A protein has these predicted regions:
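Extracytoplasmic cell-surface/polysaccharide-interacting catalytic and binding patches
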Residues: 1-215
Length: 215
């Protein structure tokens, strides 16, 4: 994996590899230990609270993705879809480790062996270093008091998110490929061109990157 360097930052989009493809982060493609987002912003300070609420005071995101996110939610609001909330953005590896360990522990409490608990946890929580949230380009978008999937807001995002460079990262019909169960709230910024192409082909990010690398 060849990542964006400081010398190339003016020509390669944020969150892309040197060949211009969106950065793929999963269990098989973990981020390098020294990976750092380029320009994180505190979303509570940065975002207009009349458009979206931020759950907690420390949620951050890569600025280019946050700008696109705000523009997208402003459009949704203009169409009568409100009550947006961001419940997760950038996560450090240490915090992701805690989330994963907590999930493993909960399964162990249900009687699973260590191996069984880790296997079950991986389907719901990415292992440290393997989470898209480390990039600052992924956000959990919710509506307070709902399970989000099936809401008008969720349906609108799935239909229109590509227009602002986002993809629904873990759709229900791609679980066998992504290795993650359906997450209707998890959206990843990949840029408009890539998002539009994935919408046209019906590919998830794993399929898209594999195809582009083989061309």
């Amino acid at each position: 994996m060849i990542l964006l360097t400081a010398e190339a930052e003016n020509t390669i989009p944020v969150g892309c590899t040197a060949d211009g493809l969106p950065l793929l982060v999963n269990r098989d493609s973990p981020l390098p230990d020294d990976y750092q987002p380029q320009q994180l912003v505190n979303m509570r300070d940065y975002c207009d609270s009349s458009i979206v609420s931020i759950k907690g005071s420390e949620i951050e995101g890569e600025q280019i993705a946050v700008d696109a996110l705000l523009a997208m939610l402003m459009q949704a609001q203009s169409e009568g879809l409100t009550s947006w909330q961001i419940s997760a953005g950038y996560r450090s590896v240490a915090y992701q480790q805690k989330l994963f360990d907590d999930k493993v522990y909960s399964y162990r409490q249900q009687g699973m062996t260590g191996a069984q608990a880790r296997s079950a946890a991986r389907k719901l929580v990415a292992e440290p270093g393997c989470s898209e949230h480390h990039t600052g380009l992924a956000f959990d978008i919710t509506v307070p008091g709902t399970s989000f999937g099936g809401t008008k807001q969720a349906k609108w995002l799935e239909e229109h998110c590509w227009e602002w460079g986002f993809i629904l990262r873990y759709p229900a019909d791609k679980t066998a490929i992504t290795g993650i169960t359906n997450e209707p709230w998890h959206f990843r910024y990949v840029g408009v061109d890539a998002a539009m192409e994935m919408r046209e082909t019906g590919e998830c990010l794993e399929e898209y990157v594999e195809r582009k690398q083989s061309e």
